[in-house]
């Protein structure tokens, strides 16, 4: 099967490596230099102290000559991708973004494509234009959005590497909100406080603030089992206690964060429902202020 991976970041390179073991994969990049490097060198993956390599094609333009397109760019980069996707023929498109900001866009995006959404539970760090470090084994989980047919992707994903499992979930909202609640509790606080994930559990004041954020987000998302969700947030914090969240890494690196995708979605939903979200509003404003002052690390 022919699969196009849109985005040459950590998730894009990770997906491209593993999917290329079973499919004809092309990475669609923004920069010609990266496309040329992937075309000539392939993709290198580092895992458990070993290096692996896979051949892969690359290009800088999107076309409809694919059985599946996997969109891995960050949410704030999606608008240019949407406009490109509107110009190609009908195909299957899987969106793998942090947060849920793109959901509002997808609901208003009236195209003939079959749309799917998913989450990435792997840890990955891009080392170069052609290399990715697989830092944590997890899974890709996906679901059909609106009236898309799940069988189309189930056929595509029937063969996968054991270190890169791909699972179908029946309820896209439950799938995405399950990860969103974790990201909303951990990412903004660690970025604001400049701490590793584990400190949110070991510092009482941080834990108390995280619980307030959790309760506010739960009310907005109307989560069914808050106790189980809170246990999940704490478990992820503990399992990744030595990690710096992606939002903290972006703040330190002077890059735009995914605050709009994570907190922005919750604030928009709160507004639509007429709910107060004072803690999330504070976090959102604080992170956006940090983005404007990227030369300052507190």
Curated annotation (Swiss-Prot):
It is an enzyme of class 1 (oxidoreductase). GO terms for cellular component: cytoplasm. The active site is at residue 179. Keywords: Cytoplasm, NADP, Oxidoreductase, Pantothenate biosynthesis. InterPro entries: 6-PGluconate_DH-like_C_sf, 6PGD_dom2, ApbA, Ketopantoate_reductase, KPA_reductase, KPR_N, NAD(P)-bd_dom_sf. It is found in: Cytoplasm. The keyword Oxidoreductase applies. NADP(+) binds at residues 7-12, 98, 124, 258. Belongs to the ketopantoate reductase family. This is 2-dehydropantoate 2-reductase. It comes from Bacillus subtilis (strain 168).
């Amino acid at each position: 099967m022919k699969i196009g991976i849109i985005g040459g970041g950590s998730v894009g390179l990770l997906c491209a490596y593993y999917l290329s073991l079973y499919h004809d994969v092309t990475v669609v990049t923004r920069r010609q230099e990266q496309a040329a490097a992937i075309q000539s060198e392939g993709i290198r993956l580092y895992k458990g102290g070993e290096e692996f390599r896979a051949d892969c094609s690359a290009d800088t333009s999107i076309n409809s000559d694919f059985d599946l397109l996997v969109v891995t760019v960050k949410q704030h980069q999606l608008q240019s991708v949407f406009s490109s996707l509107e110009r190609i023929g009908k195909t299957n498109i899987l969106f793998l973004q942090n947060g849920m900001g793109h959901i509002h866009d997808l609901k208003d995006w009236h195209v003939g494509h079959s749309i799917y959404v998913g989450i990435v539970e792997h840890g990955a760090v891009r080392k170069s234009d052609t290399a990715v470090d697989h830092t944590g084994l997890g899974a890709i989980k996906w679901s059909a959005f609106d009236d898309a047919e799940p069988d189309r992707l189930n056929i595509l994903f029937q063969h996968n590497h054991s270190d890169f499992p791909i699972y179908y979930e029946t309820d896209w909202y439950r799938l995405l909100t399950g990860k969103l609640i974790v990201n909303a509790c951990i990412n903004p606080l660690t970025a604001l406080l400049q701490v590793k994930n584990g400190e949110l559990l070991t510092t009482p004041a941080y834990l108390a603030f995280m619980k307030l954020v959790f309760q506010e987000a739960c009310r907005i998302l109307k989560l069914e089992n808050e106790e189980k969700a809170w246990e999940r947030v704490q478990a992820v914090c503990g399992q990744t206690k030595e990690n710096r969240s992606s939002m903290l890494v972006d703040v330190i690196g002077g890059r735009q964060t995914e605050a709009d995708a994570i907190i922005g979605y919750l604030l928009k939903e709160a507004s639509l429902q007429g709910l107060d979200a004072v803690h999330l509003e504070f976090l959102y404003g604080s992170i956006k202020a940090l983005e404007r002052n990227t030369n300052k690390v507190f």
